[in-house]
From Swiss-Prot:
The family this protein is said to belong to: Belongs to the corazonin family.
One cellular-component annotation, GO: extracellular region
One annotated GO biological process: neuropeptide signaling pathway
Organism of derivation: Namaquaphasma ookiepense
Record key words, sorted: Amidation, Neuropeptide, Pyrrolidone carboxylic acid, Secreted
Keyword Secreted among UniProt keywords: yes
Record's keyword annotation contains rRNA-binding: no
Modification sites for Asparagine amide: N11
Identification of the protein by name: Corazonin
Location(s), subcellular: Secreted
């Protein structure tokens, strides 16, 4: 689980 500024939480 990583945080991406424009996409939010992605798995």
């Amino acid at each position: 689980q990583t945080f991406h500024y424009s996409q939010g939480w992605t798995n």
